[in-house]
């Protein structure tokens, strides 16, 4: 047979079942778990919203492609959240405290209790510049020259890795990629969710700068050997997605994609959801392609990505602000304000 580097269905529940994920953290005393309750009675869930002193995140238990979560006080009102719960016909929902801070992701290779982590990445879920608009599968992301991001302090990255290590210790049979999405709060990192796979777009930030041969990691996992330590190039990266006009609410599918691959320059080009026809590639209703810039600073990497986007042609929406100095600085300022510094 063909060796597969990935968790079994039982371990993958850490992604596919959000109620399991929270109970697993609670039962194993894993730090970073927000206050939560699970409900299969939607009327009871709505009553909990009425009685709760503060804002909540509403999370359907199953997979929603990164677009099922609604946050009271950010995306919806309490009344809108209750309407969403009643009309969506989910079998079960998790209601948990709204986490305030800056999100980041750490991806890791896991096998036989070993965990090898990549640099932190920040994704941008909102569709429009300035973090406005509906949630998407991710409009782009960036990483810095080291393991942590500019808004993080010493120890924040290590605290998040410790949460992942304790998670793996409580799930010793887990093999594959473990994706930890965190909210950096004034109390340290809190777990937004775990995924049993690479992040999209975050994998496009980390894999191009991975200098340890990817095959060596898989071979070690297959053979039961210790996973090799991971070496990265030390470059900053910026990834930006080109999506169909109207994405995600009313995407314009069927537009011909005319990417001039010769003008991508130093950027990397990754096709995503495209429809291959006799006359070329066409958009679907999902994200079309991404470009990645790598350089010795976030700002320089952003310029490479932006230059590569000149190859995109017409009919696409792009968040040009991702990785630009003003947006990166706004993340730093946000955490500084929350910390009261």
Regions found by a protein language model. Give the residues of each.
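A short, GP-enriched loop/loop-strand-helix hinge that lies immediately N-terminal to
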Residues: 1-17, 29-39
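Short, well-ordered beta-strand elements within core beta-sheets of diverse protein domains
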Residues: 287-295
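Internal nucleotide-binding/catalytic subdomain
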Residues: 68-198
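Conserved anion/nucleotide-ligand pocket segment
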Residues: 53-74
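Short arginine-rich
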Residues: 90-91, 307-323
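A cross-kingdom feature marking charged/low-complexity
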Residues: 322-341
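Short amphipathic alpha-helices in soluble, non-transmembrane regions
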Residues: 254-256, 302-309
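Active-site "cap" helix and flanking loop/linker of ATP-utilizing ligase/carboxylase catalytic domains
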Residues: 159-169, 174-178, 195-264, 276
